[in-house]
């Protein structure tokens, strides 16, 4: 196996061309024949489907009870305004959600720049037009922003807590990546001419740097394939019913997350030894940990998100008896 790996060429990063803050072209070569399409297609699919971002998920407009309304003095109807709100490229730096407001009197053109931001929020396309107001018209609304991955359809919940009259749910496209294309060209190393060169072109909405998007996509691909590196048959052990209640990932030690030494030591100081211990902690609770700042917290959240996990998860009957017995041994 080692001999085969040594025979394969190891690609190197040849060039990173930044077209602008939204667009980058990355060139990778040399690749063995066929690897250009293999890696290019895998990275493209991950970039389009699995990059975290933020989006407006709810809007509450003064005087509007449902999305089929019209607002006096406003050129656009409510449905058009909602479609425009979906195009706002918004970035949350630390928090996972935010409440924003917008208030404007006519005559005026309402743009994304009119949204009143807090210290944690940025808008990357402030010139985006949301509505046109005539003389005497007024538009006032509250907006809810959340972080997420991929696409989430608007669901009008029947729960009393979220079924408030006038709360308009929006379909949310959280992905900051707008387009991804790749090109495979011929490459040459000495006498070999049957090699690939991969050119990856990524365009984002500005909330995520294109180069960072490629790095994150490669990290996601790495974690999805790592289980195949040490592929072994594992004997299925019949455990008590209590043990089966938990996903095996919760029983893994936090060391498996490969956090920085600083973050790992902070967690151990708080007696957080397993992933199941960690996901039950709230952000506010972790921020009270000595020497664990916002940067370390973001690292923890990003690593958990790569595994489909998040903080503030409630696990009934935790910890299982097997972990309790191990810790007391």
Swiss-Prot record:
Gene3D superfamilies attached to this UniProt entry: 5' to 3' exonuclease, C-terminal subdomain, DNA-directed RNA polymerase, insert domain, RNA polymerase, RBP11-like subunit
Region Alpha N-terminal domain (alpha-NTD), annotated ranges: 1-232
Keywords associated with the record: DNA-directed RNA polymerase, Nucleotidyltransferase, Transcription, Transferase
Enzyme Commission code(s) on record: 2.7.7.6
InterPro entries: DNA-dir_RNA_pol_insert, DNA-dir_RNA_pol_RpoA/D/Rpb3, DNA-dir_RpoA, RBP11-like, RNAP_asu_C, RNApol_insert_sf
Region (Alpha C-terminal domain (alpha-CTD)): 246-329
CDD domains attached to this UniProt entry: RNAP_alpha_NTD
Catalysed reactions listed for this entry: RNA(n) + a ribonucleoside 5'-triphosphate = RNA(n+1) + diphosphate
Domain of life: Bacteria
Subunit structure: Homodimer. The RNAP catalytic core consists of 2 alpha, 1 beta, 1 beta' and 1 omega subunit. When a sigma factor is associated with the core the holoenzyme is formed, which can initiate transcription.
Domain notes per entry: The N-terminal domain is essential for RNAP assembly and basal transcription, whereas the C-terminal domain is involved in interaction with transcriptional regulators and with upstream promoter elements.
The family this protein is said to belong to: Belongs to the RNA polymerase alpha chain family.
Protein's name according to its UniProt entry: DNA-directed RNA polymerase subunit alpha
Taxonomic path: Bacteria, Pseudomonadati, Pseudomonadota, Gammaproteobacteria, Thiotrichales
Gene from which this protein is expressed: rpoA
